[in-house]
């Protein structure tokens, strides 16, 4: 079986709760996503342990702060071995540039649009997402988190595009 370009979301507080899944998925998927809940519960050791076990790690913290703080966080994420890091595009061009300039060579920055947190999707939201993606492109970050509905336009701007997991119509959201 070839490796699938999929990140498995470790959405929970404790890495140990995912040991069975990680064992099954090892070598079959591209990597794992560590979210804010796990990172604030277990800290950098969660990323360091996953890297030690050979995983590609997507650190989904959605940074949104002043340029100096975003820059320092990007440096820290690279230092603990994260391969991907999310940053809110709404942090602004200065913050995006600061993160890009200071990050480690191996860390890829992924922009997140603040408009994507809305449950109701409309042409106005689509336009807002596109405008934020243009700012991300100007800031030379590596890629974006993109809803499937925006893929066609986004492919004109970025090669590195990550789409969130897609929930089936009848699935419980557990959000």
Describe the role of every protein-language-model region.
Residues 1, 27-28, 52-55, 103-107:
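Short helix-capping segments at alpha-helix termini
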Residues 2-3, 65-162, 166-173:
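Conserved anion-binding
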Residues 8, 62, 136:
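Residue-level signature of catalytic and energy-coupling elements of molecular machines
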Residues 29-84:
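Metabolite-binding pocket within alpha/beta catalytic cores that recognizes anionic/polar moieties
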């Amino acid at each position: 079986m070839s490796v699938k370009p999929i990140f498995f979301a470790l959405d929970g507080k404790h890495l140990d709760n995912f040991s069975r899944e990680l064992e099954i998925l090892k070598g079959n998927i591209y990597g794992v996503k560590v979210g804010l809940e796990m990172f604030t519960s277990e800290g950098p050791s969660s990323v360091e342990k996953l890297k030690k076990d050979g995983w590609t790690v997507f650190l989904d913290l959605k940074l949104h702060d002043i340029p100096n703080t975003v820059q320092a966080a990007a440096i820290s994420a690279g230092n603990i071995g994260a391969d991907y890091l999310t940053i809110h595009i709404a942090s602004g061009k200065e913050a995006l540039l600061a993160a890009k300039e200071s990050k480690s060579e191996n860390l890829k920055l992924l922009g997140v649009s603040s408009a994507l947190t809305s449950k109701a999707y409309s042409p106005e939201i689509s336009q807002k997402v596109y405008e934020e993606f243009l700012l991300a492109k100007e800031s030379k970050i590596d890629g974006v988190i993109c809803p499937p509905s925006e893929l066609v336009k986004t492919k004109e701007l970025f090669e590195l595009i990550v789409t969130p997991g897609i929930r089936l119509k009848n699935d419980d959201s557990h959000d």
